[in-house]
Curated annotation (Swiss-Prot):
InterPro entries in alphabetical order: NifW
Entry keywords, A to Z: Nitrogen fixation
A UniProt-annotated Pfam family: NifW
GO term, biological process aspect, one: nitrogen fixation
Subunit organization: Homotrimer; associates with NifD.
Keyword presence, Electron transport: no
Gene that encodes the chain: nifW
Function statement: May protect the nitrogenase Fe-Mo protein from oxidative damage.
Taxonomic lineage of the native organism: Bacteria, Pseudomonadati, Pseudomonadota, Alphaproteobacteria, Sphingomonadales
Keyword Lipoprotein: no
Identification of the protein by name: Nitrogenase-stabilizing/protective protein NifW
Family of this protein: Belongs to the NifW family.
Length: 108
């Protein structure tokens, strides 16, 4: 069976990590599974390398899956904004801190 055929049979994020021999923390994967796979796909699309050799192709997929996973170890799905719902969400506005000493009580 070819590497491409093997990938087509995978049905979960855990399957991809297992097939590509990439270690992961289940807690991180439970939160960001779709985001990680999408980010991996974006990395693969950006790389215009030759994928004729299956061993090189597997190494490339393994590298980009590990890189995408690592992105979400240090970030979050909301910060990465890969999906439309996150891209269109309003970024939270950082409000300036107000010192407690500047607050006054209203007159009675």
């Amino acid at each position: 069976m070819s590497f491409a055929d093997t990938l087509r049979q995978l049905s979960s994020a855990e399957d991809f990590f297992s097939a590509l021999h990439v270690d992961y923390d289940p807690q991180i994967l439970n939160v960001a599974r779709l985001h990680i796979l999408r980010k991996m796909r974006l990395y693969l699309e950006a790389d215009k390398g030759d994928l004729a050799d299956e061993s090189l192709q597997k190494q490339q997929y393994q590298h980009y899956l590990a890189q995408a996973y690592n992105d979400f170890v240090h970030s979050s799905p909301i910060k990465e904004r890969l999906f439309k719902v996150h891209q269109e969400a309003v970024k939270p506005v950082k409000l300036p801190m107000v010192k407690l000493t500047s607050l006054t009580m209203p007159p009675e």
